[in-house]
Amino acid sequence: MNPVIKKFQFGQSTVTLETGRIARQASGAVLVTVDDDVSVLVTVVGAKQADAGKGFFPLSVHYQEKTYAAGKIPGGFFKREGRPSEKETLTSRLIDRPIRPLFPEGFMNEVQVVCTVVSTSKKIDPDIAAMIGTSAALAISGIPFDGPVGAARVAFHESTGYLLNPTYEQLQASSLDMVVAGTSEAVLMVESEAKELTEDQMLGAVLFAHDEFQVVINAIKELAAEAAKPTWDWQPKPEATALLGAIRAEFGDAISQAYTITVKADRYARLGELKDQVVAKLAVEDGSPSASEVKAAFGEIEYRTVRENIVNGKPRIDGRDTRTVRPLNIEVGVLPKTHGSALFTRGETQALVVATLGTARDAQLLDTLEGEKKDPFMLHYNFPPFSVGECGRMGGAGRREIGHGRLARRSVQAMLPGADVFPYTIRVVSEITESNGSSSMASVCGASLALMDAGVPMKAPVAGIAMGLVKEGEKFAILTDILGDEDHLGDMDFKVAGTSKGVTALQMDIKIKGITEEIMEIALGQALEARLNILGQMNQIIGQSRNELSANAPTMIAMKIDTDKIRDVIGKGGATIRAICEETKASIDIEDDGSIKIFGESKEAAEAARQRVLGITAEAEIGKIYIGKVERIVDFGAFVNILPGKDGLVHISMLSDARVEKVTDILKEGQEVEVLVLDVDNRGRIKLSIKDVAAAKASGV
């Protein structure tokens, strides 16, 4: 056992890469340690042979957080880790995105990456360590891979500027949380959320990260120089030049003509007909070229045709130029019984978005390595197969749906009011009912509209736009509001969301090298132009949040009581508060400082609960008249209940101006009477009078 270890300084942290001690049977294995804060074991295994007939690259990335890493035992009956959490799924996608385009075209061997968090101090997110480890493990595995890749997280403060690899605590005070990954030459992936930063500030963060993670790339190269296995002897299949030429010669014009059909379904139908004709004419049964090879060549001609048209300035697939946003149709309040709803349609992409308000108890409970916490905002994205005119699996959310939902959430989250202003739990659901590109950005627009329709006091409306890029040699074209086909055939997917003042989310995935600062700057500027256009049209429908919540939403009443009254409201074993909730159908949340939030399905229910709480916490006021109930009669007077839990004594001498021989001559138990509070002594005992009520009323009490 001869482990190879490389250490390097990365910002304020010391990073250690170690291989050759753990998981030695994997193709590549690296243990990444950041100071004493995080340790992640990353393994890579590649299959030596590709599965026959597989038409895609079977790369899978699994990021997993073990509870023992934080000194915890899993909850639940089985006491072991179960299905991946949303955080694990999102981090798996984060690692996958920058490495996938660096495998050679045509490489179909299965590759599996497993990142296991084995130790954490809960100060920093382990995702950057996992990304560095993945790059290092691939670099030493011998698998064909055009790396290594570096990665970094960037925060931003107006006073101090950019901060490399911040802690959780530092992120709390930051206006930016951005993860950037790339090679020594180019940026490949950006994932971020921000608080209305400018386009220049966002671009500056990307370039700052790219400069800073060069030290990571150099360290991985040094590790690979000492520990890498021999590179696989893999050669791509030679390009089917003759087959491509035959298809282009006979069907090129027809394919080009098909891409002038602006309706997606009609275009797909025509391309399907052409593909069938090409296969029937050129495919050889049990020979070469096979039907699958002909179909692949047909797809390559499609790819080249669309790209050539775009970079040569011809109209796009649906007839637009490069800067035009598809026609918008915007409606709000489309579902009568929901709390807030919007139908956002952009061309052939449509999202039905619904906002629902709940109580603090409806917040999502998250059990993370950092500990349990409650999340009062949820945004869920659903992509049913009918949205693209297909039959398909229905079930739980997949990785793509979780990722798109998180992007939409990041986009609107910064514009939500704080819990001190709006203490409701918020759930937004985006149902994609039609899709032809940029459904996640349609979800952003729809979410902003639905939240304003629900009366959530948004700081500003938010819109999102997806940009694309086609680059051939020195020629390039940046596309505003890309279609699904343009996303698939293009070189970059660049999504920007924000308000009229600045960016709230930026996501970028690049499939090629050579994306320059100039191209990113132009794309951000073009995205701003489109975003302002969309916001202008949204504001014509609903420019600000409604003044009142929907009548269907729960009513919330906030109040505060003395802390020494909390136990009175709760009661022995919670009996009092439970009785109030059951009888009024409201829910009550009490904080240690005496703050109370009452949620009711109706205003009447919430008000009834408030009155009950007031009754319990109220103090008897000297000189005030109360309607009380006789609880107990004794020889010297009667005890009358005037407030919940508060009885006072009406002495026999205070019953009437006339002489009273027996209390029962005047009162009986259960009788309601008007009483005047005469005095409250220092022990809280209340002295009442019945005979002085008339005089008190006459004097205006």
From Swiss-Prot:
Chain sites annotated for binding Mg(2+): D487, D493
Residues covered by the S1 motif domain: 623-691
Primary localization class, coarse: cytoplasm
Highest taxon listed in the record's lineage: Bacteria
Pfam families, alphabetized: KH_1 (PF00013), PNPase (PF03726), RNase_PH (PF01138), RNase_PH_C (PF03725), S1 (PF00575)
Signal sequence, renumbered to the chain: none
SMART domains: KH, S1
Record keywords: Cytoplasm, Magnesium, Metal-binding, Nucleotidyltransferase, RNA-binding, Transferase
Oligomeric form and interacting partners: Component of the RNA degradosome, which is a multiprotein complex involved in RNA processing and mRNA degradation.
PANTHER family referenced in this protein's UniProt entry, alphabetically: POLYRIBONUCLEOTIDE NUCLEOTIDYLTRANSFERASE (PTHR11252), POLYRIBONUCLEOTIDE NUCLEOTIDYLTRANSFERASE 1, MITOCHONDRIAL (PTHR11252:SF0)
Name of protein: Polyribonucleotide nucleotidyltransferase
Organism: Pseudomonas syringae pv. syringae (strain B728a)
Organism ancestry: Bacteria, Pseudomonadati, Pseudomonadota, Gammaproteobacteria, Pseudomonadales
Gene: pnp
